[in-house]
A protein has these predicted regions:
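Preferential activation on post-signal-peptide N-terminal prodomains/segments
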Residues: 1-136, 262-266
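Conserved histidines in hydrophobic membrane contexts and catalytic metal-binding motifs
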Residues: 67, 146, 227-233, 252
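A general secondary-structure signal for short beta-strands and their flanking turns/coil
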Residues: 103-105, 139-141, 222-226, 240
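Generic short beta-strand segments
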Residues: 111-116, 208-211, 230-234
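Short loop/turn segments at secondary-structure transitions that flank enzyme active sites
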Residues: 114-116, 152, 162, 235, ...
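Intrinsically disordered, low-complexity coil segments
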Residues: 118-139, 192-197, 233-240
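Charged, low-complexity helical/coil segments in non-catalytic cytosolic or luminal regions
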Residues: 136-223
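C-terminal soluble interaction/assembly domains
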Residues: 220-223, 232-267
Length: 267
């Protein structure tokens, strides 16, 4: 069981400007990126053949240990590693043209976990049938992003929404054929409540994971095992589907994502 806390975004950053920290001739700016962000921002594939050596004096395993020591110090419990990569320092000039790229350090992303399994970080702010609502809501994600180089941690950002209490309990879930039988009933009913513009929806991904649900009392929540049926136009960005339905893995009922998000966001 989880109780809502006062969500506060926190950060640990270098006081020194990155260009002063890592100066380079002909460069005006420098920005550190994870591999995914580097590819997204530059439109360039990262080193696929691992021919570029990471200049960090720590191995990736040593760096991860230091990242997890930091998480322990800030009281981050029940988290799991979601992603890790080399750290790319992209140097640009005054015209925003790339001057150079150095690979030095690592980027780690952790998220809330249940029994050491990361919970879903899938967002519904691009889901077509939920964009018609009057107010903007989305499911908050407890994410911890840490970057480090040979000098240690240089940047960290995180936000806590929930405080865990008690022990997790086992849940009996439906077999997948049983779930599909229930889904044939519950998904059409869901789309009557939140209609979409399509005559038919072809989901292209199905995932068994944990998802946040509302508890019995105000401010009380729990992570349940669920099946997420989703359709994603951009398969390189699966956390932002265009259609998405969350089914309770125990009984096949649809979890109202918007209702849960509103309750988490309530003062």
């Amino acid at each position: 069981m989880y109780y809502k806390t006062d969500s506060v975004y926190r950060s640990f950053n270098m006081r020194e400007d990155f260009m002063m920290y890592r100066p380079k001739e002909k460069a005006t700016y420098v920005t550190p990126y994870s591999k995914a962000d580097y590819e997204r921002e530059t439109g360039t594939e990262a080193d696929q053949e691992n021919t570029v050596q990471n200049a960090c004096s720590y191995s990736k395993e040593e760096a991860q240990m230091k990242a997890e020591e930091f998480l322990s110090k800030i009281g981050a419990k029940d988290v799991a590693l979601q992603d890790s990569s080399d750290l790319y320092w992209v140097y640009t000039d005054a015209k925003n043209s790339v001057v150079a790229t150095d690979v030095d350090g690592y980027s780690f992303t952790y998220v809330r976990a249940v029994d050491k399994q990361p919970v879903s970080t899938m967002a519904f702010n691009r889901v077509e049938n939920l964009q018609k609502q009057v107010e903007y809501y989305d499911m908050p994600v407890e994410r911890y992003e840490i970057t480090m180089d040979s000098n240690g941690i240089i940047n960290a950002n995180w936000c806590d929404y929930l405080e865990a209490t008690g022990e997790s309990t086992k849940t009996e879930i439906l077999s997948f054929p049983e779930l599909l039988e229930k889904a044939n009933e519950t998904i059409p009913e869901y789309y009557k409540t939140y209609p979409c513009k399509y005559n038919a929806i072809n989901f292209n991904d199905v995932t068994l994971t944990y998802y946040l649900t509302a508890g019995a009392a105000d401010g009380q929540f729990e992570y349940k095992p669920v099946w997420i049926f989703s359709s994603c136009d951009d398969k390189s960005d699966p956390d932002y589907p265009s259609e998405m339905v969350v089914l309770d893995a125990a009984d096949g009922s649809v979890i109202d994502m918007l209702d849960v998000a509103m309750k988490v966001s309530a003062d």
